[in-house]
Design a protein with these regions (language model features):
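ATP-binding N-terminal substructure of ATP-dependent carboxylate-amine bond-forming enzymes
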Residues: 1-158, 171-179, 598
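ATP-dependent carboxylate activation and anion-phosphoryl transfer catalytic cores
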Residues: 7-26, 30-45, 49-58, 81-83, ...
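Short, ordered loop/turn segments at secondary-structure junctions
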Residues: 40-41, 62-66, 86, 115-116, ...
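Acidic, glycine-rich catalytic/binding loops that coordinate metals and/or anionic ligands
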Residues: 64, 472-483, 487, 595-612
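Hydrophobic, well-structured modules enriched for small/aliphatic residues and gly/pro motifs
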Residues: 93-96, 106-174, 180-210, 216-228, ...
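Short structural boundary motif marking the start of a folded domain
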Residues: 186, 362-366, 516-518, 524
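PDZ/PDZ-like peptide-tail recognition elements
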Residues: 502-521
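Structured functional modules or segments
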Residues: 516-612
Length: 612
C-alpha cells in the first residue's frame, strides 16, 4: 500500500509502452494554462512566481503545517490552495495518488514536481501522463537511466565516461556492500540511489562501521525520498564538486548553460554554489564533452544537471550523478546566462524548440543557502549545527540591484519541524568573483531573520575568509575554517543575529520561585521521543538521578534526531545554564512520547539533590 501511494509500483509492459508512446506525442507537447505546483518552501515560491509570470493559473498543494506558508500567500485570485493533509513527507508530499486526484479535480493541464520529493520518480511521471497530465520534466525512461544514481553510473560506463570505482548498481544489503568495499578499498562513500541534498550519504572508514551505517542511511533515504536503495563508491578526499546545467528539447537541441562549483559543503549539503572559476581549459572541455554526450545519447528532454567529481590530486574528472530535475542552485546559471530555466521547462513541455535560444555566459554569480539552524557545541566541544524550526518574528530582505532572493518565510511564518531547513536563497551577480563576494557581504549586513536561528553568521565568516576569497578550498573547506575561528564567538554572534539577546535564558528562567525544583524546557520545536526506539526503555523516568551529561530524551526536527541533556542548555555567553557540580532527580515527566513540542514547552521537572 505504501509503495502504491508513493507511486513506487511497477506498471505492466503494455502500459509502459502506451505511456512511452504518449510521452513522445501529445502529452509531452500539450498546451498549459493551469499548473499544479507539487512543492513547498523556496521551491514552491520560485515556481509560483514563474508560473504567474508565464500567465498560468496555479494550484498549490500543501501539507497541514504549510497551509499558511509564505508561498501560499503568493497565490492570486484565480489560483487555488489545496490541502494534502498530513505532517510528514510520507503523509503528504510523497503521496502521489493524492496529488494526482487533486490535479484531476482541479482540472490542471500539468504538474510541476519541484525539486525534491517525487521529482525524480519515473513511476510518478508515468502515472501523471497515464492520467492525461503533462509532467514538467524529462521522459520517464530518462529518469530510469539517470534519476537512479546507480543506473546513471552504469549508463556513464557504457558511454565510456570515467566514473569513480564502486558498486555496479543498488546494493541488496550490507553484506554486498562489504564485498564491494573490500574490493575497492576503504574509505568508501554510501549514497542514496534516489537522493540528494546531503540525505542518505555517509563516509565509512572501516569495515566495523559499514553494517550500522548502511542500515541508518537506508532509513534516512527512505524517509527523505520514499526509496531506501543505496549504492557505494570509492571516497576521494581532496575534490571539487562541479556540475553542468543542461537543457534539451524534443527536437534534439542541446544547450549547456555553464559550470557551477558546489564545493563549500557541510555533511554533503551544499551551503554556497557559484559559477566555476580558475578551471584548466582541459577540465572545462571534458565537463562539456561528457555532459553533451550523455544527454544526446539518452535523448534527454528538459532541464537537468550533470554532476562531476574533480580529483584535485590526480587532476581528473569523474562522473558522479545526474539530477533529472532543477537544482536548488539553478539561479546561479540563470544569473550568468539570462536564461529563465523554469520558463524554458514550460516551453519544452509545450513542444517548443530551443533552436534559437542564445546562451552567453557573463560575469560571476554566487548563491547562499540560508537554513534554520542553531550552532552550539557537542559533548566533545566541537561545533554542531542543529535544526531550529519555530516562528519567524521578523524577516527582511531589501530589494537591491544584482541581488536576487527566493524566500520561504516572512514576518510571522512558522518553520515546521517536518522538512528540510532551507528558508531562503540569496544570489548575487558581479562582473567577477570578487565583486559577487563583496555584494553578498554588503547585502547580508542588512538582512534580518529573527525568531529562529540561521546560518547567516557562518555565511558571513565564509565570505570574509581569505582562503575562500582566494579560491583555495575543496569539499573539506569548512573543517579547516572551523579550526581557525572561535566557536564561542560564532555561537554568541549567531544568537544575537537571531534576535536572541532579549529571549536568552538565564538561571531564573528555569528555577521555580522559592523551591529547589528546576524546569527543563524544550530548546526547539520538534518531535519528543523518550527513547531511541520503541523496543528500548525510556532514557529517564520519574525518580531517575541525572547529571549534566545524562541523556534525557531525543528531539526530532527536520529529519535529524538530537540527544538532549542538561549540557545542551547554554546561556548567551556559552556557559552551562545548570550548575555543573550538582546532581538532580527527575520528579515529573510532562511531555508525551512522540508528541510535537514547541520551543519553551516544559518537558521535565527535577530537583537538586546535592548542595550548590
Amino acid at each position: 500500500i505504501s509503495r502504491t501511494l508513493t507511486g513506487e509500483y511497477n506498471l505492466s509492459t503494455q502500459l509502459d509502452q502506451e505511456v512511452e508512446s504518449l510521452e513522445k506525442s501529445e502529452l509531452m507537447q500539450s498546451d498549459i494554462k493551469r499548473v499544479l505546483v507539487h512543492a513547498r518552501g523556496c521551491t514552491a515560491a520560485r515556481l509560483i512566481q514563474a508560473s504567474q509570470e508565464h500567465g498560468l493559473e496555479v494550484v498549490l498543494v500543501q501539507s497541514d503545517p504549510d497551509m499558511e506558508s509564505y508561498p501560499a500567500q503568493l497565490l492570486r485570485e484565480n489560483d487555488r490552495l489545496v490541502c494534502l493533509g498530513g505532517n510528514t513527507p510520507q503523509e503528504s508530499y510523497l503521496n502521489a495518488m493524492s496529488v494526482i486526484r487533486i490535479a484531476e479535480i482541479e482540472g490542471v493541464d500539468a504538474i510541476h514536481p519541484g525539486i525534491g520529493f517525487l521529482s525524480e520518480s519515473p513511476q510518478y511521471a508515468r502515472i501523471c501522463r497515464e492520467h492525461g497530465l503533462n509532467f514538467i520534466g524529462p521522459r520517464s525512461d530518462n529518469m530510469d537511466l539517470m534519476g537512479n544514481k546507480s543506473n546513471a553510473i552504469n549508463t556513464a560506463k557504457r558511454l565510456k565516461i570515467p566514473v569513480v570505482p564502486g558498486s555496479e548498481g543498488a546494493l541488496a544489503n550490507s553484506s554486498e556492500a562489504s564485498d564491494v568495499a573490500e574490493e575497492i578499498g576503504y574509505p568508501v562513500l554510501i549514497k542514496a540511489a534516489h537522493g540528494g541534498g546531503g540525505k542518505g550519504i555517509a563516509v565509512v572508514e572501516q569495515l566495523g562501521q559499514l553494517e550500522q551505517m548502511f542500515i541508518r542511511m537506508s532509513k534516512e533515504a527512505l524517509n527523505a525520498f520514499g526509496n531506501g536503495d543505496l549504492y557505494l563508491e570509492k571516497f576521494i578526499r581532496s575534490l571539487r564538486h562541479l556540475e553542468v546545467q543542461v537543457l534539451r528539447d524534443l527536437q534534439g537541441n542541446s544547450h549547456l548553460l555553464g559550470i557551477r562549483d558546489c564545493s563549500v559543503q557541510r555533511n554533503y549539503q551544499k551551503l554556497i554554489e557559484e559559477s566555476a572559476f580558475d578551471l584548466p581549459q582541459k577540465i572545462q572541455g571534458q565537463l562539456f564533452k561528457y555532459s553533451r554526450k550523455l544527454i544526446d545519447e539518452i535523448d534527454y528532454v528538459g532541464a537537468g544537471t550533470v554532476e562531476f567529481i574533480y580529483d584535485l590530486g590526480e587532476q581528473k574528472i569523474y562522473f558522479m550523478e545526474m539530477n533529472t530535475r532543477l537544482q536548488v542552485e539553478h539561479p546561479v546559471s540563470e544569473m550568468v546566462t539570462g536564461v529563465d530555466l523554469v520558463n524554458q521547462q514550460f516551453s519544452v513541455a509545450k513542444g517548443n524548440s530551443l533552436e534559437g535560444l542564445e546562451v552567453r555566459p557573463n560575469g560571476h554569480a554566487m548563491e547562499l543557502r540560508i537554513n534554520a539552524e542553531r550552532v552550539d557545541l557537542d559533548s566533545s566541544g566541537s561545533l554542531r549545527f542543529v535544526p531550529d524550526p519555530g516562528r519567524v518574528t521578523e524577516a527582511y530582505f531589501p530589494a537591491e540591484e544584482n541581488i536576487r532572493v527566493i524566500q520561504a518565510v516572512t514576518n510571522g511564518s512558522m518553520v515546521p519541524p517536518f522538512y528540510d531547513s532551507l528558508v531562503a536563497q540569496i544570489i548575487a551577480w558581479g562582473e567577477d568573483r570578487k565583486e559577487a563576494i563583496e555584494l553578498l557581504l554588503d547585502y547580508l549586513s542588512r538582512v534580518k531573520i529573527h525568531g529562529i536561528s540561521t546560518n547567516l553568521v557562518l555565511a558571513k565568516r565564509i565570505l570574509q575568509d581569505q582562503d575562500f576569497q582566494e579560491g583555495n578550498f575543496d569539499t573539506r573547506y569548512l573543517k579547516g575554517l572551523f579550526s581557525r575561528i572561535s566557536p564561542q564567538e560564532l555561537i554568541k554572534e549567531s544568537k544575537l543575529e537571531a534576535g536572541g539577546a532579549a529571549n536568552s535564558l538565564d538561571e531564573s528562567s528555569v528555577r521555580f520561585e522559592n523551591s529547589k525544583e528546576w524546569k527543563i524546557l524544550s530548546p526547539q520545536m520538534g518531535g519528543f521521543y523518550r527513547s531511541p526506539s520503541p523496543e528500548t526503555p525510556a532514557l529517564v523516568e520519574e525518580g531517575s538521578v541525572i547529571n549534566l551529561q545524562t541523556p534525557l530524551c531525543l528531539l526530532e526536527s527536520m529529519k535529524v534526531f538530537n540527544e538532549i541533556s542538561l549540557n545542551s542548555f547554554k546561556t548567551l555567553d556559552g556557559k552551562s545554564l545548570y550548575p555543573e557540580d550538582q546532581q538532580f532527580r527527575i520528579t515529573r515527566v510532562l511531555a508525551e512520547d512522540q508528541q510535537t513540542v514547541n520551543q519553551g514547552d516544559l518537558l521535565f521537572v527535577m530537583e537538586s539533590i546535592t548542595p550548590n
